[in-house]
UniProtKB/Swiss-Prot annotation:
AMP 1 binds at M265, L266, T267, I268, T269, D270, V310, H331, R332. The AMPK pseudosubstrate motif resembles the sequence around sites phosphorylated on target proteins of AMPK, except the presence of a non-phosphorylatable residue in place of Ser. In the absence of AMP this pseudosubstrate sequence may bind to the active site groove on the alpha subunit (PRKAA1 or PRKAA2), preventing phosphorylation by the upstream activating kinase STK11/LKB1. GO terms for biological process: cellular response to glucose starvation; fatty acid biosynthetic process; positive regulation of gluconeogenesis; regulation of carbon utilization; regulation of glycolytic process. It is linked to Defects in PRKAG3 are the cause of the RN- phenotype which is associated with excess glycogen content (about 70%) in skeletal muscle. This mutation originated in the hampshire breed pigs and has beneficial effects on meat content but detrimental effects on processing yield. Signal peptide: none annotated. This is 5'-AMP-activated protein kinase subunit gamma-3. AMP 3 binds at H331, T380, A385, S406, A407, H478, S494, L495, S496, D497. The keyword Glycoprotein applies. It comes from Sus scrofa (Pig). One of its GO terms (cellular component) is nucleus. AMP 2 binds at R250, K350, S422, R423, F424, D425, R449, L457, H478, R479. A motif (AMPK pseudosubstrate) lies at residues 318-339. ATP 1 binds at R250, M265, L266, T267, I268, T269, D270, V310, H331, R332.
């Protein structure tokens, strides 16, 4: 079957909006559809081909109003999908949610009267609420407690391994086991000051992306169909981590059948915490922990201090989604049906920036897109978390836990960047059953890994913000490493840094520094 026929068939399948019944359909051996997206860095210049995880369609028009009737949704008619641009993104790694901030902490930006002219998305509350969406999942949707996932059967060659890195604090910790202490790694000196960003925010048009995200809802950014893996809390930890690898996902919502609700997320961070806590323990062997159930893990290590799952409604704005992701230091934001409580979709930094990148070409271009990274000072340049290539893997785990970051630039003795070690590299220790060899140095681990990971994509201080955004979206990565001409590390520009600058800073909100 041709790709176009598969995509058409996908839109006709009932129940795809809820995300419970469908997995992403893609012909064997073929990647995501390419899409022509105008470059932010060269207005009116030639278009470049992108390997996009979002299906944009033939025309680049504004996302239509998010209006669908109950009848249309129940019959699986996806013709009125808000923007018709979306294909399920490759699933990314995410840290577990932190404490929910609650409605009182949601940011409210003042209108300046300089809003860009674009159509508003009708809130679902005024159109068709999602009450008709399927109720919480059935047995076939959830991996039951007796489900087994074999590492030898795990096929991970297709995984998208981009992981967001923010050197300030990239991930919250649901389990609450992280203690702040100095990381045993070198840290470059400050090389770039923050110079012109505050001035740019005072110029007309600086709030165009902020207003755009305020006027569109999470429903607009939801995939037509998506792959969603859900774990029952009675599943054994070992089987759960193997299932993450086997299904090519980095996080899964946790369903508590006793409470009949979602109670959290299981992520690669949890696997790192298990290794970090018990690798050197003289009392407990790691294989004993493998037999624990997820429920037991949560009860023992949360010690009754359960934090609410950070989530968002499809009626909420994309502005609120950006704020929730950055404020709570999480990588995945579940979109929950406000009536049934079912998980409809999971939003990520990468998906939100892709949405903004596609339709941002139809908006007036702010002048700050033409300014250089060095002038604007967007990114992290102080106290960077890095790891020496000669350091053992256990040292990298220490840094992941202590600094709460999701990827580490790997440097040699002279400070040159030679690689990137991410949290997702750690989960493959489970897939290869080599997590008892954490004394191997990071450089050797990078040479032995079987997958072609995201790699080290870099930028230089003289490049403009528009060029940096184009490269991140085109390469589908979560950060660019800022280097000089000799490949010495200067800083890191992450998705959080960019979304903070484009969406939150114009509203006077600093979620990264909060």
């Amino acid at each position: 079957m041709e790709l176009a026929e598969l995509e058409q068939a996908l839109r006709r399948v009932p129940g795809s909006r809820g995300g419970w019944e469908l997995e992403q359909l893609r012909p064997e051996g073929r990647g995501p559809t390419t899409a022509d997206t105008p470059s932010w860095s060269s207005l009116g210049g030639p278009k470049h081909q992108e390997m996009s995880f979002l299906e944009q369609g033939e025309s680049r028009s504004w996302p239509s109003r998010a209006v669908t009737t109950s009848s249309e949704r129940s019959h699986g008619d996806q013709g009125n999908k808000a923007s018709r641009w979306t294909r399920q993104e490759d699933v990314e790694e995410g840290g577990p949610p932190g404490p929910r901030e609650g409605p009182q902490s949601r940011p409210v930006a003042e209108s300046t009267g300089q809003e860009a002219t674009f159509p508003k998305a009708t809130p679902l509350a005024q159109a068709a609420p999602l009450a008709e969406v399927d109720n919480p999942p059935t047995e076939r949707d959830i991996l039951p407690s007796d489900c087994a996932a074999s590492a030898s059967d795990s096929n991970t060659d297709h995984l998208d391994l981009g992981i967001e890195f923010s050197a300030s604090a990239a991930s919250g910790d649901e389990l609450g086991l992280v203690e702040e202490k100095p990381a045993p790694c070198p840290s470059p000196e400050v090389l770039l000051p923050r110079l012109g960003w505050d001035d740019e925010l005072q110029k007309p048009g600086a709030q165009v992306y902020m207003h755009f995200m305020q006027e569109h809802t999470c429903y607009d950014a939801m995939a037509t169909s998506s792959k969603l893996v859900i774990f029952d809390t009675m599943l054994e930890i070992k089987k759960a981590f193997f299932a993450l690898v086997a299904n090519g996902v980095r996080a899964a919502p946790l369903w508590d059948s006793k409470k009949q609700s979602f109670v959290g997320m299981l992520t690669i961070t949890d696997f790192i915490l298990v290794l970090h806590r018990y690798y050197r323990s003289p009392l407990v062997q790691i294989y004993e922990i493998e037999e624990h159930k997820i429920e037991t893990w949560r009860e023992i290590y949360l010690q009754g201090c359960f934090k609410p799952l950070v989530s968002i409604s499809p009626n909420d704005s994309l502005f609120e989604a950006v704020y929730a992701l950055i404020k709570n230091r999480i990588h995945r934001l579940p979109v929950l049906d406000p009536v049934s409580g079912a998980v409809l979709h999971i939003l990520t930094h990468k998906r939100l920036l892709k949405f903004l990148h596609i339709f941002g070409t139809l908006l007036p271009r702010p002048s700050f897109l033409y300014r250089t990274i060095q002038d604007l000072g967007i990114g992290t340049f102080r106290d960077l978390a890095v790891v020496l290539e000669t350091a053992p893997i256990l040292t990298a785990l220490d840094i992941f836990v202590d600094r709460r970051v999701s990827a580490l630039p790997v440097v040699n003795e002279t400070g040159q960047v030679v690689g990137l070690y991410s949290r997702f590299d750690v989960i493959h220790l489970a897939a290869q059953q080599t997590y008892n060899h954490l004394d191997m140095n990071v450089g050797e681990a990078l040479r032995q890994r079987t997958l072609c990971l995201e790699g080290v994509l870099s930028c230089q201080p003289h490049e403009t913000l528009g060029e940096v955004i184009d490269r991140i979206v085109r390469e589908q990565v979560h950060r660019l490493v800022l280097v000089d001409e000799t490949q010495h590390l200067l800083g890191v520009v992450s998705l959080s840094d960019i979304l903070q600058a484009l969406v939150l800073s114009p509203a006077g909100i600093d979620a990264l520094g909060a």
